[in-house]
Structures are given as structure tokens and as C-alpha cells.
């Protein structure tokens, strides 16, 4: 998912997306540990998606704090 797509979402939608990505990451890690994962690159993709979502959440929080001050 692109950061530009994430910036159009609300904070609540981003938090839900983050929860889903963390669940997917956990599932992929378990599959990797039990050697059931065929596409190992999925682990890195999910990790980068989590980083994107967290970055956009931080941007929104910073913007909200700046507008309040």
C-alpha cells in the first residue's frame, strides 16, 4: 500500500489497518518458523507496510498537535 493512499484514511482506519498488518506479520512469522511459508519476501513487505502506516499516524499526530498549539 502506498503512503499517499494511507494519508487519505482517517486515524481510526489507520489503526485498524495497523492491527490487521500486525496479525498478518504474526501469522507469517509462525509460518516461517514452521517452514510452511513459500513466499519469504512477504515478511519484509508486511514489515514495510507497518512502517508506512506508523509513519502516517505519526505525521497526523504531529499535525494535530501543531494545529492545537
From Swiss-Prot:
Concerning Pfam families, the annotation shows:
Ribosomal_L29 (PF00831)
Its encoding gene is what?
rpmC
One Gene Ontology molecular-function label:
structural constituent of ribosome
Q: Report if keyword Ribosomal protein is assigned.
A: yes
InterPro entries with a match to the protein in the record: Ribosomal_protein_uL29, Ribosomal_uL29, Ribosomal_uL29_sf
Q: Which family does it belong to?
A: Belongs to the universal ribosomal protein uL29 family.
Q: Per the record, what is one GO cellular component?
A: cytosolic large ribosomal subunit
Task: Tell me the PANTHER family matching this sequence.
Answer: 60S RIBOSOMAL PROTEIN L35/50S RIBOSOMAL PROTEIN L29, LARGE RIBOSOMAL SUBUNIT PROTEIN UL29C
- BP-aspect Gene Ontology terms: translation
Gene3D superfamilies xrefs: 1.10.287.310
Q: What is this protein called?
A: Large ribosomal subunit protein uL29
Which keywords belong to this entry? Ribonucleoprotein, Ribosomal protein
Amino acid at each position: 500500500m502506498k503512503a499517499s493512499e494511507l494519508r487519505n484514511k482517517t486515524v481510526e482506519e489507520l489503526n485498524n489497518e495497523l492491527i490487521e498488518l500486525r496479525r498478518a506479520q504474526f501469522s507469517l512469522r509462525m509460518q516461517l518458523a514452521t517452514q510452511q511459508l513459500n513466499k519469504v519476501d512477504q515478511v519484509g513487505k508486511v514489515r514495510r507496510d507497518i512502517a508506512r502506516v506508523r509513519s502516517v499516524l505519526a505525521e497526523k499526530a504531529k499535525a494535530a498537535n501543531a494545529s492545537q498549539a
